[in-house]
UniProtKB/Swiss-Prot annotation:
It is found in: Cytoplasm. This is Cysteine--tRNA ligase. Coiled coil: none annotated. Pfam families: CysS_C, DALR_2, tRNA-synt_1e. ATP binds at K268. A motif ('HIGH' region) lies at residues 29-39. A motif ('KMSKS' region) lies at residues 265-269. Monomer. Its cofactor is Zn(2+). Its EC number is 6.1.1.16. Keywords: Aminoacyl-tRNA synthetase, ATP-binding, Cytoplasm, Ligase, Metal-binding, Nucleotide-binding, Protein biosynthesis, Zinc.
């Protein structure tokens, strides 16, 4: 598999340090608020990576942490009249609920920062002993950035350029404006722990270094997160870990792109902040997961409700094809009509292309393109009145079951019973569009009556009236059926 390594800025062949085993760490949430769709993207991207690596036979140990002590958590605790621990527990619970709905697998190891205070203190002590960090009279501990010559190697930033714009805030006791906090002296009303420098709490960056070192052998095979974490968080992780341990921290760095809303970066200040729960009020969870896979993970993805509608339509087409394929397979008699020679070859090619897309830096967008290619091929067979009855078509439909199982295993979508998904989707669209089903049923009943009376002008007028309500009517041998446009 080729992976784009943010450290080398190029694609590299992925080879685990220990053949057959992968140690992977992804930065998790700071538990102070509901998860937004940026969190959803990171979670889904690395969930697919874990799924795919396991699909290829690798033994993956996956860790994702929780930051449960932080300035934002303390601020939220004061706002809500809760303790920091209560706030963190509340939003860790909502994180799990959201991830379960998005079919994101639980990590094997889910460490919390507050459970690793001793490890963080020990790492600080090691850095101080090496002259890479220093304690201030007030009890803060800072990392000496200039003591690590390779600082900036991940983000590509020049240390002198950073220095020119850096300032020491009033009250700080930094030796250099670039230095960052490893340990923060306690403030009144904040959670704190006893340390060699007095009461205090860890800085954000030291947390992931201490937790990953405790739970996994270093260097990690893969460390992931959003592109916003490259600097300063991941840059600082590298500096403090490698300075303390004198060995590489991570072999492959992977970063997913931003989620934009209407072509602007999502932020609370712009008023375009979308939580997962906001979106799932109007769309099925599988639609959101599918949408997040429609772009390459390193590219930005633009969230709009139009793009969600398009993702919903695409997913609906796939499930409709799977439903039709299942219906056709129930046929009792099959003909000996041969399929064109290239059909089976095309089926095989699309299957291989799906895997090749994921081998190429986890290109889920291309992989989904090959899923659609497979569905188009199946639809082409089922639309041909002769080929749909062929025993060779039956053999391909039976193989389709295996492909769908693989798609589900790797991408985490297409795994529901088609009829159940389509029924839930219809109900979801009815709610989202505020459709009055009582009125729809009454119009359909009237249309049935006027058609029986051969008043086709009125029947067509009712069809148009239903279309204006967002309803599509199809006449079948067993009667009219309707769906939401």
């Amino acid at each position: 598999m080729q992976i784009y390594n943010s450290l080398s800025r190029r694609k590299e062949l992925f080879t685990p340090a220990v053949p057959g085993k992968v140690n992977m760490y992804v930065c998790g949430i700071t538990a102070y608020d509901l998860c937004h769709i940026g969190h959803a993207r990171s979670a889904v991207v690395f969930d697919v990576l874990v799924r795919y690596l396991r699909h290829t036979g690798l033994d993956v140990t996956f860790a994702r942490n929780f930051t449960d002590v932080d300035d934002k958590i303390i601020k939220r605790a004061n706002e809500e009249g809760l303790t920091s621990q209560q706030v963190a527990e509340k939003y860790i619970d909502t994180f799990y609920e959201d991830m379960d709905r998005l079919n994101v697998l639980r990590a094997d190891i889910e460490p919390k920062a507050t459970g690793h205070i001793l490890e963080m203190i020990a790492l600080c002590e090691k850095l101080i002993a090496k002259g890479k960090a220093y304690a201030t009279p007030s009890g803060d501990v800072y990392f000496r950035v200039r003591s690590f010559p390779e600082y900036g190697k991940l983000s590509g930033r020049d240390i002198d350029d950073m220095r020119s714009g850096a300032r020491v805030a009033p009250g700080e006791e930094k030796e250099d404006p670039l230095d960052f906090a490893l340990w923060k002296a306690a403030k009144p009303g904040e959670p704190s722990w006893t340390s060699p420098w007095g009461e205090g709490r860890p800085g954000w960056h030291i947390e992931c270094s201490a937790m990953s070192e405790k739970h996994m052998p270093l260097p990690l095979d893969i460390h992931g997160g959003g592109q916003d974490l490259i600097f300063p968080h991941h840059e600082n992780e590298i500096a403090q870990t490698e300075a303390a341990l004198d060995k590489p921290f991570v072999r492959y760095w992977m970063h997913n792109g931003f989620v934009q809303v209407d072509a602007e970066k999502m932020s609370k200040s712009l008023g375009n902040f979308k939580t997962i729960r906001d979106i799932l009020e109007g769309y099925l969870p599988e639609v959101l997961r599918f949408f997040l896979l429609t772009k390459h993970y390193r590219s930005p993805i633009d969230f709009t409700f139009d793009s969600m509608d398009e993702a919903e339509k695409s997913l609906k087409r796939i499930y409709e094809a799977l439903s039709l394929a299942r219906t056709e397979r129930s046929r009792s008699k099959w003909s000996a009509t041969p399929l064109p020679a290239d059909v089976t070859a095309e089926f095989d090619t699309l299957d291989r292309a799906f895997d090749e897309a994921l081998e190429d830096d986890l290109n889920t967008a291309a992989a989904l393109g090959h899923v659609f290619g497979t569905i188009r091929l199946v639809n082409r067979l089922l639309e041909d009145k002769n080929l749909r009855k062929s025993a060779e078509t039956l053999a391909l439909l039976e193989r389709l079951d295996g492909l769908v199982a693989k798609w589900m295993k790797v991408l985490g979508v297409f795994g529901r019973e088609p009829e159940a998904f389509l029924s839930d989707l219809k109900e979801c669209r009815i709610r989202r569009k505020g459709i009055d089903t009582t009125k729809v049923d009454a119009l359909l009943e009237e249309r049935k009556s006027v058609r029986a009376a051969k008043d086709f002008a009125r029947a067509d007028a009712i069809r148009d009236e239903l279309a204006a309500l967002g309803i599509e009517v199809r006449d079948t041998p067993s009667g009219a059926v309707w769906d939401v446009l």
